[in-house]
């Protein structure tokens, strides 16, 4: 189906706007995925703050020009699904990685984070980033363990002093 120039410009503007506000992006090949599965993916994406769009390659290249995701231009071959994480850098990577487990034909092509290209083989690096809440919890656990360890060392030093004095 041929798109009019105005429609193409609207798509480029929409994807460019999503790219400018995004923390990371993931590109995938959705060839062979059923409509029902894609609908489920889009629903999960909305729930996780991820913008998902199937875009023509030339329009995708134009949309990411001048953004941190320009490094993805080489992955725009064949059917292209692009997902932008808006709330958490690893959200799109995690979502598409989990979706690919249930879809044999779904293939992640690559990702970008802070202007750096991440190959599909290394997508786990981005998917395993902790959320803000998880990072805070890890920080609190580290601080708690450090203070408990310091307390134990203080008690051990006090015990050693008393043993030396006796």
Swiss-Prot record:
- Provide the Gene Ontology terms for cellular component: large ribosomal subunit
**Name of a matching Pfam family:** Ribosomal_L10
One Gene Ontology term of the biological-process aspect is: translation
Disulfide pattern: none
Q: Which InterPro entries match?
A: Ribosomal_uL10 (IPR001790), Ribosomal_uL10-like_sf (IPR043141), Ribosomal_uL10_bac (IPR022973), Ribosomal_uL10_bac_type (IPR047865), Ribosomal_uL10_CS_bac (IPR002363)
Source domain of life: Bacteria
Record has Lipid biosynthesis as a keyword: no
GO MF annotations in UniProt: large ribosomal subunit rRNA binding; structural constituent of ribosome
What keyword terms does UniProt attach to this protein?
A: Ribonucleoprotein, Ribosomal protein, RNA-binding, rRNA-binding
State the protein's purpose.
Forms part of the ribosomal stalk, playing a central role in the interaction of the ribosome with GTP-bound translation factors.
How is the subunit organization of this protein annotated in UniProt?
Part of the ribosomal stalk of the 50S ribosomal subunit. The N-terminus interacts with L11 and the large rRNA to form the base of the stalk. The C-terminus forms an elongated spine to which L12 dimers bind in a sequential fashion forming a multimeric L10(L12)X complex.
State the family it belongs to: Belongs to the universal ribosomal protein uL10 family.
This one is known as Large ribosomal subunit protein uL10
Please tell me the species this chain comes from: Shewanella frigidimarina (strain NCIMB 400)
What lineage does the source organism belong to?
Answer: Bacteria, Pseudomonadati, Pseudomonadota, Gammaproteobacteria, Alteromonadales
